[in-house]
Amino acid sequence: MDLGLSGKIALVTGGSKGIGKAVARGLAQEGARAAICARGQDALREAAQEIEKATGHEVFPVSGDLTKPEDAQRVVDAVIAHFGHIDILVNNAGAAPGGEILHLTEEDWEKALQLKFMGFVRCTKAVLPHMLRRRAGRIVNIIGNDGVKPLGIEVSPSAANAADLAMTVALAEQYGRHGICINAINPGPVATERWDELIGGIARMRKISVAEAQKRAEHSIPLGRICTPEEVADVAVFVASDRASFMNGAIITLDGGQRKALLD
């Protein structure tokens, strides 16, 4: 199936590793030219070189700290200066601190909201004027299923993700009229560095081994395993493509059936 992505310009935040890197690679494999954004310059350059070598398509690395409003605008401006425009924005950067509310500090909450929520807001605000002028665009927000099914041990990510989901649906209604489709993907557990940190924290909190915590996590998923970054990327690439041209305001759950939804 031709996804119609050849020649499209995509900006992927959090693109130096994990899900973001897999999404950028997936887009490049379909012929898109990708810009990737992250804070760490070395990891960013390495990721860009790796994707270029694997796909034969240009990847433009641009460093930025999306907790800073001026950085989000600068990143978008740099991508437009380099490629001419942006067709696709994939908001992926940021992970909120986990833990129960009594263990979270004000700083933890600030981190959760500044990167996981306000980072999405800032990048979206920066690209929207350009997409409005072209009357076309795709915004894919990679969020997390605890925004719909909150967890006590993940209270700050749950809150930030819920805010991202609300923004997705609200903006889809507002900007769909202008040819801009805005959708969300809610992954469950995904095998990334972030998951390794999270499962380690769960193991310590429950006073069990990491192997046992991993086993229990896998058992909670009907498919019996953790999702891969590439599986999230496959969905994101499709949602960003012309083949999903009537998808707008959708929230796609990608958790292997882990969380019940129908009346619970």
State the predicted function of each range.
Residues 9, 16-18:
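Conserved glycine-rich cofactor-binding loop
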Residues 100-101, 108-113, 139, 217:
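Substrate-binding pocket helix/loop in short-chain dehydrogenase/reductase
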Residues 104, 150-159, 170, 198:
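Active-site loop-to-helix junction immediately N-terminal to the catalytic Tyr of the SDR YXXXK motif
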Residues 124, 160-161, 168:
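Active-site helix of classical SDR
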Residues 129, 173-174:
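Alpha-helical segment proximal to the catalytic Tyr-Lys
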Residues 149, 237, 248-264:
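Short C-terminal tail/terminal secondary-structure segment
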Residues 176, 181, 247-249:
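Short, small/polar-rich loop/turn modules that mediate ligand/substrate recognition or access, typified
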